[in-house]
């Protein structure tokens, strides 16, 4: 679903305890190393290791923040009304298995690189829980931290455009052949009908 299709009035998803921990860690890094940009892959691994080593008492403050945010989210969702027609979305066209794979967005590339790390910290989380966590982390990132993923998305878009052009170029001759074959069959059928009339 594109950005234009998203409902801006929908309440922001609740943050997990770990997301608050990562947020605090990023703020701490910014204070201690103001001129050092965050290398997200390394930073994510470091946060994961520190969270695992943190005692439950230390995690308590982050769980409290998460619970308060859950209360906020539940309250906002009670008064939220989705736009009309959202439940009756258009049916997607059947995909051609030979068509090029769609290009990935920056967020999808980010998710692919960080999904396993979240799963290792929270092995019992569902796919939906992990997706929410990824979304929360993505929103918390600065524009500078997103640059590597934006570049990856731009490169993949170039790949898709090129592959799509080649795919369409191959598809045109095939459509022409099908059309010609259909016309030929139609002519043969007319010819047979005509012969039949003459014999009568």
UniProtKB/Swiss-Prot annotation:
<dbReference type="InterPro" id="IPR009071">
    <property type="entry name" value="HMG_box_dom"/>
</dbReference>
<keyword id="KW-0158">Chromosome</keyword>
<dbReference type="Pfam" id="PF09011">
    <property type="entry name" value="HMG_box_2"/>
</dbReference>
<feature type="DNA-binding region" description="HMG box 1">
    <location>
        <begin position="11"/>
        <end position="81"/>
    </location>
</feature>
<feature type="region of interest" description="Disordered">
    <location>
        <begin position="64"/>
        <end position="103"/>
    </location>
</feature>
<dbReference type="GO" id="GO:0003677">
    <property type="term" value="F:DNA binding"/>
</dbReference>
<protein>
    <recommendedName>
        <fullName>High mobility group protein 1 homolog</fullName>
    </recommendedName>
</protein>
<dbReference type="GO" id="GO:0005694">
    <property type="term" value="C:chromosome"/>
</dbReference>
<keyword id="KW-0539">Nucleus</keyword>
<feature type="compositionally biased region" description="Acidic residues">
    <location>
        <begin position="190"/>
        <end position="200"/>
    </location>
</feature>
<dbReference type="InterPro" id="IPR036910">
    <property type="entry name" value="HMG_box_dom_sf"/>
</dbReference>
<dbReference type="Pfam" id="PF00505">
    <property type="entry name" value="HMG_box"/>
</dbReference>
<keyword id="KW-0677">Repeat</keyword>
<feature type="DNA-binding region" description="HMG box 2">
    <location>
        <begin position="100"/>
        <end position="168"/>
    </location>
</feature>
<comment type="similarity">
    <text>Belongs to the HMGB family.</text>
</comment>
<comment type="function">
    <text>Binds preferentially single-stranded DNA and unwinds double-stranded DNA.</text>
</comment>
<keyword id="KW-0238">DNA-binding</keyword>
<feature type="region of interest" description="Disordered">
    <location>
        <begin position="169"/>
        <end position="200"/>
    </location>
</feature>
<feature type="compositionally biased region" description="Basic and acidic residues">
    <location>
        <begin position="64"/>
        <end position="86"/>
    </location>
</feature>
<dbReference type="GO" id="GO:0005634">
    <property type="term" value="C:nucleus"/>
</dbReference>
<dbReference type="InterPro" id="IPR050342">
    <property type="entry name" value="HMGB"/>
</dbReference>
